[in-house]
C-alpha cells in the first residue's frame, strides 16, 4: 500500500518537529475533544477516542491533560464546535491527495490548504475528485519482531481483512474501519503489542514518483501538516528505494 509504511519515518519525524513547535498538542487536543463529543468519553467503547488517547500518550501528553480534553468534549460548549472537513486534490506527478481537517471555520481552513497545493505544483479539487481512489479502513501497526504465523492467526481470528509484512519487519493489518476496536482488542489479547491503530484512508492505486517529483510531494505533505487545522494527509504517491536514495 502506498502512502503508509514507506512514509512511517517521515510521519514520525514530522511528529517530533511538531512537538517542538507545540503544534502537535493542539491537534491532539482537538481530536480528543471531538472524538469524545461524537462518541462519548469511554475510550473502551469509542475506537476514535482510544486512538486519540494512544497518540496523545505516545507524544508524552499527561493523563491529566488528556482527561481534561475528554471532559471538554463530553461537556460540550462553544469550544467543541469542531467539524471534520475533507479536502481532495492533485499533487505533483498527478498524485491523489486527501487532507483531513478539524476546524470551526471553513474559510480559514481552505485559506491554509489551497495555497499549499498551488505552491507545490498541485491543485485543490472538488469533492469526490480523488476520494474514489481511497478506501476507509482500520489500520493496525505491529513493530518488527512478531512471529508472522502466530500474528496472522491471531489477526484472522480477531476479524482482520488482511495482514501485510513490511520490508522493515513490521506488519500492517487492515480491518473494516467499524471493526477496528474489536480487531485491536483481539490481537492484544493474543499477546501482541500494537504500535499504532487508527482509521485511515488506504489508496487503491499508486503513482510512482521520480527523483524530480518526489521532493515536491514531500514538500506538499510538510506544508499541509504545518497547517493548524490539518489532522492527517493521505496520498497515493510511491517512491522506490532507488529514488529515495537520491533524495
Swiss-Prot record:
One matching Pfam family: TACO1_YebC_N
Compartment(s): Cytoplasm
Gene3D superfamilies: 1.10.10.200, 3.30.70.980
MF term (GO), any: DNA binding
GO BP field: regulation of DNA-templated transcription
Major subcellular site: cytoplasm
HAMAP family on file: Transcrip_reg_TACO1
Protein name, as recorded: Probable transcriptional regulatory protein MS0710
Lineage: Bacteria, Pseudomonadati, Pseudomonadota, Gammaproteobacteria, Pasteurellales
